[in-house]
């Protein structure tokens, strides 16, 4: 029996994923599922460039802006939610289209994940309160005594990984890295994934990054982050690592001008986009890569989407503009 197909549309930030995925879903009876780790948070739809309300009224969107940044979230929790949504969409006779750029989520969904035990809410609270009280260096020192292996692999400045490693050891009595050596578990082995990687020419990508950031800064991201800063204490928004948050907080604290905050965010966004492209090129082998160097070529991708739904040798699509490899 032929496996049902799931589409993953991935690529760097500001590469056109949202627009292309939306048009694709409208044309081919699809529903969209988020596969971006920052777009799950409900407090930050603007800074994370989440789909607009107009988009959401045209077709169903799932797993966007549903979670508070004060809540703990993990790749395993995401996978369970995504698997449930995928099966529901297929049961309705529709096509699941996952859109995003978080490599860990994509890799875990397609190739399997390390089954690390769930952390109790009490332990999560204790770990965060401890970190808030003693800071990164002292928490790293505690981790080194408990789990030298994890401490040797985690930078003292990596707050989220430090807390996570501490939680896992306290919960299980084992290093988080011990779970990485076990066979990976597949959550959707009964389905076939077709991965489409959007890889715009770098100059064009950097231009779209700049345009998006200017729009985001003008359309409410400052107020969005100011509200979070007003309502929450810092330990409550450790999860919020979207590019631009740190820079806007620095502006709100009077440490950067608005122009400097925008400039710093643009630099960090370009670096982030470059890392994403490198990751997708090197880590996802079985994929269709679509290259384009301007908006017109990006839009033309919609013309070849029907061909991508058909099982075929990838060489057949190589001569179709935009370039497919």
UniProtKB/Swiss-Prot annotation:
It is an enzyme of class 2 (transferase). The keyword Nucleotide-binding applies. Its EC number is 2.5.1.75. SUPFAM superfamilies: P-loop containing nucleoside triphosphate hydrolases. GO terms for biological process: tRNA modification. This is tRNA dimethylallyltransferase. GO terms for molecular function: ATP binding; tRNA dimethylallyltransferase activity. Catalyzes the transfer of a dimethylallyl group onto the adenine at position 37 in tRNAs that read codons beginning with uridine, leading to the formation of N6-(dimethylallyl)adenosine (i(6)A). It holds the Pfam family IPPT. PANTHER family: TRNA DIMETHYLALLYLTRANSFERASE. It comes from the Bacteria. The record marks 102 as: Interaction with substrate tRNA. Keywords: ATP-binding, Magnesium, Nucleotide-binding, Transferase, tRNA processing. Substrate binds at residues 13-18. ATP binds at residues 11-18. Its cofactor is Mg(2+). HAMAP family: IPP_trans. InterPro entries: Dimethylallyltransferase, IPT, P-loop_NTPase. Residues 36-39, 160-164 are annotated as: Interaction with substrate tRNA. Belongs to the IPP transferase family. Monomer. It catalyses: adenosine(37) in tRNA + dimethylallyl diphosphate = N(6)-dimethylallyladenosine(37) in tRNA + diphosphate.
């Amino acid at each position: 029996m032929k496996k049902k197909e799931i589409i993953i549309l991935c690529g760097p930030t500001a590469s056109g994923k949202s627009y292309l995925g939306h048009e694709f879903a409208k044309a081919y009876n699809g529903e969209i599922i988020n596969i971006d780790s920052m777009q799950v948070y409900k407090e930050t739809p603007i800074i994370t460039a989440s789909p607009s309300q107009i988009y959401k009224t045209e077709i169903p969107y799932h797993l966007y802006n549903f979670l508070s940044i004060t809540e703990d979230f993990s790749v395993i929790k995401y996978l369970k939610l995504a698997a449930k949504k995928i099966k529901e969409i297929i049961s309705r006779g529709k096509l699941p289209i996952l859109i995003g750029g978080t490599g860990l989520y994509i890799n875990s969904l397609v190739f399997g994940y390390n089954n690390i035990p769930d952390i109790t809410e009490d332990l999560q609270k204790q770990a965060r309160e401890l970190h808030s009280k003693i800071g990164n260096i002292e928490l790293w020192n505690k981790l080194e005594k408990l789990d030298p292996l994890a401490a040797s692999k985690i930078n003292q400045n990596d707050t989220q990984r430090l807390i996570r490693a501490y939680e896992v050891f306290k919960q299980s009595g084992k290093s988080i890295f011990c779970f990485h050596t076990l066979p990976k578990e597949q959550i959707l082995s009964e389905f076939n994934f077709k991965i489409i990687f959007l890889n715009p020419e770098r100059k064009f990508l950097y231009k779209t990054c700049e345009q998006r950031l200017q729009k985001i800064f003008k359309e409410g991201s400052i107020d969005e982050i100011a509200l979070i800063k007003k309502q929450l204490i810092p330990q409550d928004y450790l999860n919020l690592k979207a590019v631009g948050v740190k820079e806007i907080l620095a502006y709100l604290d009077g440490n950067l001008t608005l122009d400097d905050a925008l400039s710093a965010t643009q630099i960090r966004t370009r670096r982030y986009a470059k890392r994403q492209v490198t990751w997708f090129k090197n880590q996802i082998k079985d994929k269709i890569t679509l290259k384009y160097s301007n908006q017109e070529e990006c839009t033309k991708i919609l013309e070849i989407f029907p061909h991508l739904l058909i099982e075929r040798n990838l060489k057949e699509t190589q001569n179709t503009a935009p370039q497919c490899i």
